[in-house]
Amino acid sequence: KLNKKKKGGDELPTGAITKLEEVFDHIFWKRRKLIYNKYLEKGNIVEEDSLQLLSEVEGTTYWKNDEFLENEYLQGTPDNIFNRVRDTKSNYEFDTFKKAELTTLYSWQIKGYIWMAIGAGHKIERTGELCYCLINTPCHRIEAEIKSMWYSMGMPEIDEERWFKAASQLERNHIFDIAKFKEDYPKFDLYNSFWRDIPKHMRVKTFEVTLEDSDIEHMTRRSKMAKEWLLNREIEELELINSK
């Protein structure tokens, strides 16, 4: 997130400072906002399914990486390290997959992973990949979405045509490989009876990201600036505490 240069010098952008405020509250006050939502939940649950899909599409087995990487400035764990760094993002539904693009945040994330992996001794390319994967949504999440929609529609009778069509559409928006879904959840009672699977190769979107020497200089500089900001923030907070 530390990637914006303002006129008149290199300064931390507003977004970075907002994030640093959260980091400070977590470290100093041991308070932080708990982030857990349906998007993160699905991403965590289907992480290995995304790697499996990517493996099948590219004809290479990609194992989940569990190695925690860090250097003096960064830390993190990419999803896969094989010849190059790969990180998968599992979209929540069809619409979000169609709109998915390489964001600035994800680009810097991949660059950071490449830098740390090379520093840890991995013989990899300086080009990594961000891979969006469209994976079946877990059944309990589909059930939750159906229940929420049922309330939003005024609790219609389940045999009403408008309800049946809406529930069927919702299932199609979250299930892309019906054979695998039935294999994973054989007891799930589906509304929809007409299925058109999306081919596996059309359920992966890959963006390449290359690490340049200037990127390393930028991350190093911004990391030092962030540490200095946190130190000054601590001094301010201690002065405020001791002011009375």
Predicted features and spans:
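Extended amphipathic secondary-structure runs
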Residues: S193-K244
